[in-house]
């Protein structure tokens, strides 16, 4: 069987692949995640996921390389990962009591042929109304700092989520159903 390579350092993505029983290696892609193009959120996460997977596929001679990228979008404003405490508090203050969308791009590239599948998933997340004190206590845990939108749906922030419409796993960072479809196109069956 061809090796599967995850082009991500995300412990959450690694855990999701482990839960599927997939044997995989991790090789982090060191790519510029800034795109200056005026494109839709779906196109943005697809391009970034593909860029990450392609960078690793250039190094590897064989295997299936998985790249992913997640952004949170409130209204028409994309929210990346907060860079400091104040930014995390501001993001969560803006998200609380509202609905937002989470876009996760997925790219699977066959390193030996260059054949690729690139797609994305959109999920709607509804946050409860939060107090300033709740937000600050959550930010003080440190959990928001490496997460798009400043929260971890699978962590402590789960108590802030009123509802999710779409793919929970996509909010965590990897649209599992779409990944299974992409791997199947390359002859890899999960079950």
From Swiss-Prot:
Could you name the active-site residues?
69 (proton acceptor)
Which CDD domains does this UniProt record tie to the protein? Answer: Maf
Q: Which InterPro entries match?
A: ITPase-like_fam (IPR029001), Maf-like (IPR003697)
Keyword Manganese in the entry? The reply is: no
Its protein name is dTTP/UTP pyrophosphatase
What cellular-component terms does GO give this entry?
cytoplasm
Cellular localization per UniProt: Cytoplasm
Which top EC class applies here?
hydrolase
Which chemical reaction does it catalyze? dTTP + H2O = dTMP + diphosphate + H(+); UTP + H2O = UMP + diphosphate + H(+)
One GO BP annotation here?
nucleotide metabolic process
GO molecular function, one example? dTTP diphosphatase activity
Looking at the UniProt record, the site noted as Important for substrate specificity sits at 12, 70, 154
- Quote the NCBIfam families the UniProt record gives: maf
Q: Which cofactor does it need?
A: a divalent metal cation
Could you name the domain of life of the organism this protein comes from? Bacteria
Which species is listed as the source?
A: Desulforamulus reducens (strain ATCC BAA-1160 / DSM 100696 / MI-1) (Desulfotomaculum reducens)
> According to its UniProt record, where is this protein mainly located?
cytoplasm
- Entry keyword set: Cytoplasm, Hydrolase, Nucleotide metabolism
Family of this protein: Belongs to the Maf family. YhdE subfamily.
Task: Give the function comment from the record.
Answer: Nucleoside triphosphate pyrophosphatase that hydrolyzes dTTP and UTP. May have a dual role in cell division arrest and in preventing the incorporation of modified nucleotides into cellular nucleic acids.
Q: What is its EC number?
A: 3.6.1.9
